[in-house]
Structure formats: C-alpha cells, structure tokens
Amino acid sequence: MAGAAPRRLGCDALIVVGGSAMPRRVLHVPVHVRACNLTQELSTGEDARFCRPRPVNVERVRAVFAALYRACPIHVRTEPERVKLVLGRLLLGPVAVPCFCDGEVEGHGEHLVPTTQFCRGPLLYVHRRCCCGSVTAGRALSYHVLENHVATHVLRGLLSLTEWNRELPSLFCDCPGGGGASGTEERYAMACLPRDLSLHLDDYPYLMVEIGRVLSVSEVDDYVTAVSGYLGEAAAPRIQVHYKLLFGLNVRPQAPCALDATRDFFLLELQKLWLGVEYHHEVTSEFFGRVLAQLHRDRARVMMALRLPEQTVCHLSTFVLSRFKRQVLYFKLQVSYGKCRTGHADRSGGGGNGGNQGHHNLLCYRRLSVTFADTDTVWRNLFYVYYELARDLGSHGTENRPVNRGYGVSCAPRTSRLSPSESTVVSANGHALSSTALPTTSAGHKLSLPRDPAADRVRRYVCIISRLMYARYGERWRKHRQRRSETGEEEEEETLESGETDATPPFDFTGQQLRRAYQEHRRRKHLAVQRYAPCRRKLIGGMEFAEVTGVSLDRIAVNAFNTNRVINMKAALSSIAASGLGVRAPRLPKNMTHSFVMYKHTFKEPACTVSTFVSNDAVYINSLNVNIRGSYPEFLYSLGVYRLHVNIDHFFLPAVVCNSNSSLDVHGLEDQAVIRSERSKVYWTTNFPCMISHTNNVNVGWFKAATAIVPRVSGADLEAILLKELSCIKNMRDVCIDYGLHRVFTQLELRNSYQIPFLAKQLVLFLRACLLKLHGREKRLQLDRLVFEAAQRGLFDYSKNLTAHTKIKHTCALIGSRLANNVPKILARNKKVKLDHLGRNANVLTVCRHVEAHKIPRTRLKVLVEVLGVLQSISGTPHTREVIHQTLFRLCSAAAATSGLCSSPPPLCVSSSSSVPSVPTSVSVDGSSEPTSPRVRFASR
C-alpha cells in the first residue's frame, strides 16, 4: 500500500529522487533513558492538541495505517498478525518527546516538528553527527539528556514496546557515544511518525475501519484483553481509553440519533434475554410482551428502571405470588423469600425505591421480600417493570385487553412502516413477539422520526453492541491469567534454572498460546471428573446417577452399588388439560404445611415411588420426591410414566439428589472378622448387628462378612469415603487379601453390574479350593488365571432378579409379589433360616465357623476339613492360620464327641510335612459309622 503524497507543513518535505513517491519511514526513538521519562513534560499540551477538532482526511489516515503496517517486524508475516501489531500501537496511544537541535538536522526534517517551549526536563540534546563517524543514512545522530532548557523541536508518534521496534531504523546511532544503546534496555519506545502523519482524536474511528477489514470484533476484543494482561494493571487504563476511541465513544450524536441508538441497544439486550430462555410458551412470551409494550409506551421511565443498581430496593404495589413462582421456574432463576424489614419500607422518589445497606437485588411487596442472585440484577429490574410499571396494561401488553390467540403476544398494529431497527422475535409456535408493541403516545412526537444523515455514527454504536456478545472470550483470558499467576513461582524457578533472565513468556500475537491453554484446561477438567469411572467412560446424568462407583487403592478395589436414591424436583401442573377434561383442580388451605405428602404413586416398571408434597399453589407447581434405583435414563423414564398418570406440563431439571444409599463388598479377605476389629472411634448399635464407622460426617455401617452400607452421599463424596475406608483396611495389622479371588469377584461385579449372590460366590470359592486340593498349591497362579478367564467368558454370570439375597423393595416390586415372597430358606434345628443368614459376602472360613459338625453328614465334614487344610496351607498371615487351626479343632472335636468313642476331644496332630491336619483315629470319616443327622429340607412360604 503506497502512502499519500507528502504535504508542506511549515517546511519542505523530504525530496525524493527518482520520480516515484518513497514510502514513509517510521523510526525508533527512545522515551525512557536511564529511568528518565522524556514524555511527561509535554503530556498535557500534547493531549490538548490530540483532542482538538480537525477535519478528517481519509487519504492521510490510510497513509498512517500503511506506514504502521510496513513498520512490523520481518517475522510477523501474515496479514492478521501485522494488523494486530498496528492495533497494539494504537492502543498504547500517541506520545511526544521534546528535543533541542543546535542547527538543521539533515535527512530528518520530516520527523522533527518545530516548537518553542521551555522544558524543565529531561529532554534530548540532538547532535548533527555521532562521534563514531557512522555515516549510515538515518543513523548518524547522537543525543544527550538535558534539563532546564528550551525545546526547539518535538518528535511525535505512537508508544510501542521495544521488542516491536527492534527492526525499525533508529533516529540515533547505536554506539554508546550516540546514546541509542541506552534506550534499548527500556521496555517502552516510540514509533516516530513523519510530522504530516501525526494522529488526532477524530482519526481513531477511521483507523478502526481499516482494522475491521481484516479482524473481527471478537478478535479485536481478545487482543485487547491479551495486551492488558501482558502489560499489567498500570497500562490498562491507557489501553481502555484508546480502545473506546477506536469505536468512537467520544462522538456525541444529535439527540434523535442518540435516543434511537439507546432504544435499539435496550431492545437488542431484551431480545438476547428472550432468545436465551429455554421455554417459549404463553408464560414467558406474556412476560416479555408486557415489558416490551411498556418500553414503547413509557420509554424513559422503563429505561431508568432497567438501569437500577443492585443496592436499590424495588417496592411493588401489585404482586401475584403464584404467577411469580411459575415465571421464576421457567426462567430458571434462583430466588429466596423472606420478610421485608423496616429499613426496606423507606421509599425515595416517585419510583418507589428505598435504600438499605447490606441487601442487594431486593424486590419487596408489603411484608414479603424476594432476593435475587448477585448476577440477576437485570431480571430483578424486569420483574419490577412487569409488576409495577406495566400493571395498568392488559395481560398481553395492551390497554383494551384483547383476547389471547395462541402463545404469541398480541399487540396493537402500527400504522407506519417499521424501521429496520424495529425487529421482531419469533416465539416457539411461530407467532411474532414484537419488539415495537405500542407507538409512543406523547404529544408532539411523531411515529416516524427522521434518520440522522451521519450514518457512520450509528455504526459505531452497533460495533459496541456487537462487542458485548463476545465478552466470554475475555473471561477465558482472565481465567488463564489467574491460573498462570497461581503457578508463577514454579515457572520462575524453572526459568532461572534454564538461565533465562526474563521469566515473562514472549507475547502471543496470534492467540495460539491462549487456545492451547484453554484446550489443556478442558482436557484436565474432563479427566478430573472421570478419573474413577470404569474405562473413563462418560457417565450420563453425572457421577451422582452412577449405578456403580469404583475406587482402588494400591491393589485393593471396591465397587459400591447404589441401592436407592431420593431425588427432589419441581413440576408444573397443566391446568388447561385439567379444565379441558373436566377435572377439578385441588384447592388446598393456606395453612397446610409444605412437608405434608398429598398423594403417592408406586410403579412396578420402572420400580419407583413418587411422592407429591403439598403446595399452596398446587394448581400450578408441585414438589416431587422420587425414590428410585437405577441410572439417569431410568429416572427420565420414570418421569415419563408418572406423566401418564398426572397432568404434568413441565419437569424442571436438573433434579437434586438429596439422599443416595450405596452398598459394597470387600472381596478376597481370608478372615472377614478382622475388618470390624482394630478400628478407632467406632460404636456398636444395640438393636442391629452393625459396627458404625464415622468418616467425613457419614456413618458407614459394617456388617458381618465384610459388607458395608454408605448412606446419604454419592459421586465424589462417596469416592472420598471409600478411599478413606480402604486406607483403614489396608493399614490393619492382621488383614490378608487373596488377590486371585479379589480379582475374580471384582470382575464378576463389573461384568454383571450387580452384587454377587451368596450361592454364586460359594460356588466359585469351593470350586477354586477343590482345584487347589486336586492340583496342589504349586499350581495356584495357573488355577487363578483359569478361574478368572472363566469368569470373563460368563461361566459364573448370575441374574439380577434373585431375591434370596436382597431386601430391596424395588426389586421385589419389579418381579411381582408372588415371586418376591418365595424367598428360599433352610430348615435347621426346627427353625427356618434364610439361605444368606451368614452374610451375602461370606467366604469359606466364615461359613465353616458357623457349621455344627454333628448336624451334617461325615462326607461333607471330610470335604470341609480338607478345604480348610488347603486354605491354611496358602494363608499369608499367622493370625489366619491360627483361626483356621481353631476351626478345624472345633469341627473334629465336635464330631468325635458326637460319635461317643471318646469322652474328651483329642488334640489335632499337624505334621510338619503337610499343613493338612490329620483327623483323630477315633473319628470315622469314611462314612461307615455316620451318625443320624437331622434331615435338611427346603421350605418356602
């Protein structure tokens, strides 16, 4: 891009030999020399000159932009990067340096502007030539710093970073005598422009036009945020001022244009709020329709109400609580209700607003106060306009109360043609939600105002409004700065070790560093949420709805299965459907408590219970309490089934999991009684055989056979409790885990997504023990691998609908009452005993501890003795071997006493060659003298 032809301003311009215009040069000039600020003396006068009105020459502005574009470093090659560098110089703004010349400076007259001003200093004393003898064109000058001297010339340009000017030709020699070397040590420098290309205030919006041809508004906003973060808080005000000048905030348009632009701004913001609402139906469209109608009816008052600060308390004279609750639910706003204090009743002015210290976003009606969230001030003001300012309008924004036809907002027709700025919003059913509902009725104001001929001034407001839509990009950069400041100390240590002196990373001109940091942040957040999920799969509904929560510590893994969860949510009843079907809506007295259950529904498919609580506005809103076991899709399925029985308009998600109960089994323990010993800060319940362990304010109940229940928590809280419980188990002195069995049973749980029943576990335990008996303990690893592969292939899979091992109400409801009552039991000692009365997770040692030798046949006793002998041989702790030894002694002694061959049980003889105990000779184990044992039969109700 070629620059414009130079003009004469006080002296001759540079004479170019060759017939063609030579591109204007931008020179490097220091602004700080040995910590002396050269710009402070002329700052006031230069600011006045910069703000002085001056006719804008578009060609001169293009020449300035072209000169700055050519002044970019060589390594900045792409056009967007070069334009960003030009934008960075414009954001730092204009600057001027005074100097004194003892004569005419040859070759640099186009950059020196004559002036006569006494400066206290510092200022530059410019020599004609440097003492080093350098005769390079444009680099032959030298300078010294003076004070209390008259300045004869001024150098004007744009403030820049020294790193941006490294490849620019310098006005002064780089030798130590010339003084140019001292300026390179400073952070800031000046890109000196020719004197006929100096900038003024009115030139900035036109420079933004040149920038906008390459960069979008969002890219400009991101770059401004990045520059502010890179240069620090000291330079941020200067950057913000020049950033606003680029969009023409200094221009004050005429009154009609300003009013139209402000109205368009409010309309655009209201339409953005409307498009951000999830539900588009009669409730939401009626709300925005009334607000927009009041905006066109009383523009000034509504605009002032929408700008009310959060400290101002808004008082209402009319209010409908049931309608307000419904609107808040559909808008998904968090509000809290309370009593209006005496300080809130003080009103100020005609708007009915009172001030109160310490309270924010308050909406008061008589003795009721509604508090909005800190970020919902705009919504608070919208409700104030809806209930207070628009109370004299009809239900749909008109004074004559027209009949509602559809979900749209019916408005009075306009007689004049709509202007392009008067756009419409389309509702969910296709009807138009007009943003120009009513014309202004004030006297002397016409329906159509003449447009301002200065259309470029309106475009500046449009640019500012468009920039507001990209505020989230700046928020990302601020979060990135915060994360970088938290880890700044570690980065400085790494930088010092690597030998670099500047710990600040190089400035990112293209934004690639910011994009990489944001992608890394998203990846880490994704992994942090799913670090405990099986195979890192995404859990639909979140971790709170996970059916299985698995954690591991070293080699110990535990899977916690959800038994049931209680979910609270709200739903809106369909009053239209009820009236159309002839159903009378229930009318409840105002004094009924909200904790009272109005009615309850129990379903078999899916198995759940839905309780509906009392509400004073039960015609519109109900609070639901869902008790269910299952995943998030099953929960949504249950809501669909519930909707078939009750006239529900909408369910308001997300739901809140207020209570979640889980059950877990610790597999592979050789002695399961150890887990309830060696525990501190525990207590035993008197009416239930359970040991309570208090962890993270949650009472974890441990039953026999290493089974536990964890109430109230889910998700990350449940994982934290499980990890602490595993840490306690791991540090117990007498705990020994058979990792072969532990791996098999953990795989079975994950494969079937259900806890292992009693019979299925006993089958695997005794099958593995018999294999060890047949093949020897030397083949233990091979046998464990064989059993694990069989479990992986589904040989030991089991059904979820078995009820012999569960008390879960929902499972019984799922399979039916007849099958649920047929729970298998065994008849022992003339008493019915549940099949899993020893515990669902009981192992071989736990079962053998409770076996009575005189009640079972001798052949089975022989098998149990041999199995216990195998377990004693492979046990890893002396404690477990001692417990097995005592169990064997009890079984053999009981069998000997029953046979009547000896009066006292003889001691067990354990040989050194084999760990399997020898059975006393007085006891026959071959079955020849088998005593008469009570008949064992199955009984069912």
Swiss-Prot record:
Gene Ontology CC terms: host cell nucleus
Coiled coil (UniProt feature): none
Primary location group: host cell
Residue ranges, compositional bias (Low complexity): 910-929
Compartment(s) where it occurs, according to its Swiss-Prot or TrEMBL record: Host nucleus
UniProt keyword annotations, A-Z: Host nucleus
Region described as Disordered: 479-508, 910-941
Biological role: Functions concordantly with UL87 to initiate transcription from over half of all active viral promoters in late infection, without affecting host transcription. Acts on and binds to viral early-late and late kinetic-class promoters.
Family according to the record: Belongs to the herpesviridae UL87 family.
Protein name: Uncharacterized protein UL87
Higher taxonomy: Viruses, Duplodnaviria, Heunggongvirae, Peploviricota, Herviviricetes
Gene designation per UniProt: UL87
